[in-house]
Each structure stands twice: as C-alpha cells, then as structure tokens.
C-alpha cells in the first residue's frame, strides 16, 4: 500500500485562485489581489481592512445597489449619502465635501455603469481630510481614468464577477490594492481570520496547526470558479470592444431624440459600459418600462436610491434627500447591453423605445 491522500483535487482552495488574482492584478496595475466569494463580500472585506467600526461615517452615493452602503453597516459604521452629478450620475465631489464631519473615515466611490468617478477631486478631498478611498468597481473592470485602469488609483478597489458583469465566475469578487497591510487583513478575513503562515502564528504545534487572528468569514471562492475567471480574462478586451460597438449604435440612433437622454461620457475617461442608462422625458417611465417588458425586451432600472428602501427609512434615513439622485431615478431605464446582443435585436430595442417615447 502506497498511502492514502485526503483529497486528490484542489476543488475548494487551489492554484487557480492565485493565478486569477495575479491575472487581474496585472491587468489593472495593482500589487495585490484577494479573490473572494462575491462583490458584496469584497466591499465588506475592504471596509474591514479600512478599520470601519462603530462611530465611523463613510460617504457614498445613493444611486447604487444597496451593497455599496450595506458593507458599512456590516462593520458597525454609518453610511452617509452624498448627491450625484446630474450629468455622470456618479457621486459629486462637491457634496462629498459638504457631508464630511469629524467622524468621516472613508469614501466609497461607485463607478456607476462603468463610468469612472472624478477621482482627482475625490483623492484631493481624501488627502485633505486623511480619508481612505475605496472604489466600488463592480461595473468597471476595464474602465480607464486619465490613462490608468480602475483598480490602480485608490487605497482599495472592489470588483464583482456576477453573471451580468464584464466577466463572470458564476458568483465571485475581488479586491485589489497596493497596500500590503490591507492585503493581509483581507486575505485573513475571507477565511475566518485563520492562517497557517508560520511568520504570523505565535506558535506551531505541528503540520495540522493553524491560528485565528481576526473574526473573519467564510468568504472563500473556489478553484473551479477562478479557473473560469482565468479563461474569462482572456476574453475581457474582446467583450469590452463589443460593448463599445453596441453603445456607439445606441448613441447614433438616439442622437436626435429630444425625449431620450443618452449617457454622458467624460472626455478623459473610458467607460467599461456595464450598463447603458437612458433618461426618458415627456413620457411615463413606468408605461415605457412595462411596454418594453411586454415586448420581450429586458430593460431594468439602475438604481433606486438606497436611502429610499424601507430598511433605511426605518433606520434613520427618512429625512435624507438627494435631489439629483431622485430626479435621475424618476426617469432612467437601462437598455440591453451585453456582448452577445445582435444588431437585429438592438434595432428592435431602438425602434421600440423611439416609438414609445414619441420619436
């Protein structure tokens, strides 16, 4: 008998995780990456590494998925909502400054739809007040700000690999950073705060030994998922190029439409175009939305301002109002945008929306 192994294949934790982390880190230009179970856990880990806790405030946008604010609550902190720029729909640095108090510890900047935020202005404010900057790049893998990819700009950046994102691992997420301390904290956090690293442990009783140093979570991603992620990364630039082609056709089709407002693109940025969000004017948004769904078109709305959700209304946010975010929310519809969308399908979307909006 030659011996018995406990497991023949590294299905849960294996070499593809490190390979995927290195691939994404190299792509965006970051030193370190931590692959994790999903985009929400990535935000949670980033807030944990930033030291967010009770009494701390974190400024973020209301025009986002709830996870961008919930991650602050998970750590015991308080989300504070700054209004958005009416053109880009991203967080407005001027309102960030207005919302800063002596309890502010960090800013979470969300690159809505893949359009990068005004990071120079945000970094200037963060430097002035000694704040940590976390970028929620769930929509923005491949997006570029002034010649640099999102993921190389701030203290930490999170990504999501949900099925509708630029690439997918089924479910999955990642945090990238140049800060070794943040990296080590997040690597522990995703696996119960446990390590087998001799350089960190206070003692070692044998090959079986491990120690827990933080109250972490089981946020591990599997080797199988990361193998898919490695394959997807080889296709990312092709996916992004196709998204840009679709966006260009939408922009051209709606260029002369008074009742359809197309996304604003900053001249010194490149959006990853996760979403194509239009505003419909002089017509009933709900009627347009429901009619398009009835015609088999998968439209959506991104997003309901976070503080308008019942949970937030019942927990101290009932008097919060961000005028720009609420005005934008009342008019927006997200049109289908994915690499497999055909020109014929897109023409059907365009013609249907124009007809419903009186164009």
Tell where the protein language model's regions lie, with residue ranges.
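PLP-dependent aminotransferase class I/II
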Residues: 15-23, 27-31, 94, 106-110, ...
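Phosphate-binding glycine-rich loop
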Residues: 10-57, 71-75, 81-83, 148
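Conserved active-site segment immediately N-terminal to the catalytic lysine
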Residues: 135-168, 184, 208-213
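Active-site PLP attachment segment
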Residues: 152-196, 223
């Amino acid at each position: 008998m030659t011996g018995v192994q406990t497991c023949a294949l590294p299905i849960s934790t294996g070499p593809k995780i490190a390979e995927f982390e290195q691939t994404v880190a190299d792509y965006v230009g970051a030193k370190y990456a931590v692959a994790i179970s999903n985009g929400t856990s990535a935000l949670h880990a980033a807030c944990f590494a930033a030291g967010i806790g009770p009494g701390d405030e974190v400024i973020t946008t209301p025009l986002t998925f709830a996870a961008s604010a919930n991650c602050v609550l998970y750590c015991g902190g308080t989300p504070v909502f700054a209004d958005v720029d009416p053109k880009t729909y991203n967080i407005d640095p001027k309102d960030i400054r207005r919302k800063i108090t002596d309890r502010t510890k960090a800013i979470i900047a969300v690159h809505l739809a893949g359009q990068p935020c005004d990071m120079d202005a945000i970094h200037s404010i963060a430097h002035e007040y000694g704040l940590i900057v976390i970028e929620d790049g769930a929509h923005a893998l491949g997006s570029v700000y002034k010649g640099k990819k999102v993921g190389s700009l701030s203290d930490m950046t999170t990504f999501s690999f949900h099925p509708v994102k630029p690439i997918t691992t089924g479910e999955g997420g990642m945090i990238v950073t140049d800060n070794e301390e943040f990296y080590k904290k997040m690597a522990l956090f995703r696996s119960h705060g446990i390590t087998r690293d001799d350089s960190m442990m206070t003692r070692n009783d044998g090959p079986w030994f491990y120690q827990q140093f933080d109250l972490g979570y089981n946020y591990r991603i599997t080797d199988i998922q990361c193998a898919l992620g490695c394959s997807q990364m080889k296709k990312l630039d092709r996916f992004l190029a196709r998204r840009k082609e679709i966006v260009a056709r939408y922009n051209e089709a709606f260029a002369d439409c008074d009742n359809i407002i197309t996304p604003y693109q900053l001249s010194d940025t490149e959006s990853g175009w996760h979403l194509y969000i239009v505003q419909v004017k002089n017509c009933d948004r709900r009627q347009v939305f429901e009619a398009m769904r009835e015609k088999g078109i998968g439209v959506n709305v991104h997003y309901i301002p976070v503080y308008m959700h019942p949970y937030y209304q019942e927990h101290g946010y009932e008097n919060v109002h961000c005028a720009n975010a609420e005005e934008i929310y009342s008019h927006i519809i997200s049109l289908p945008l994915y690499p497999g969308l055909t020109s014929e399908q897109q023409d059907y979307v365009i013609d249907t929306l124009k007809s419903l909006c009186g164009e």
